[in-house]
């Protein structure tokens, strides 16, 4: 049985992904920040692991990841506090990458956002700036690891029933991305080796997810 750990397992994408992977036969460990999130993730079929990644040291992260074949980073500070945003979305994310390498976990899937990167264009006075900077640094660090990484870059997240269809050639005018579609893309990517070393930009669209992801070609450093 494939074993995977989802960091940020109580988030909306993490919960949706847990259910999908359990249905596909994965054994899911769901990393959560507080014990009061335990019952929710257990109900999704995952094994809860209480670990505050903002405060966790390297050894604790290595121990949490050991024995798994893949890790998904779907955690986030949630904005509002720049110091905590850098601590979680950049520093803790990078520690998790180092821990994955030390624990021998090869596959690493990062949930980022459409437009992330050093040229994100967000003004420093904008409250989104710390998040944009943190994600740019974390994504770039991941690209420079030895891991079999994939970065997902969905557009603005929405709720509601997922369409199951996306586009991997998004335009600026149509950037909404259903969280259920993000979870489905993550599951499809984990089953598609050709997505290794890819940054996949996508939004809701017209192509079935399996077809869209299956049509991608692996390009190292993309």
Give residue spans per PLM region.
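Glycine/proline-rich active-site loop of Rossmann-fold NAD(P)-dependent oxidoreductases
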Residues: 120-122, 161-164, 189-198
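N-terminal Rossmann NAD(P)H-binding glycine-rich loop of SDR-like oxidoreductase domains
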Residues: 3-26
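Structural motif
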Residues: 3, 69-70, 107
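NAD(P)H-binding glycine-rich loop region in Rossmannoid oxidoreductase-like domains
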Residues: 30-95, 99-102, 190-194
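Flexible, glycine-rich beta-alpha linker
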Residues: 118, 150-170, 202
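Conserved Rossmann-fold NAD(P)-dependent oxidoreductase catalytic core, especially the SDR/UDP-sugar
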Residues: 27-29, 35, 77-144, 150
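Core catalytic loop region at the nicotinamide-binding pocket of NAD(P)H-dependent oxidoreductases
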Residues: 189-213
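Substrate-positioning beta->alpha
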Residues: 93, 134, 152, 173-188, ...
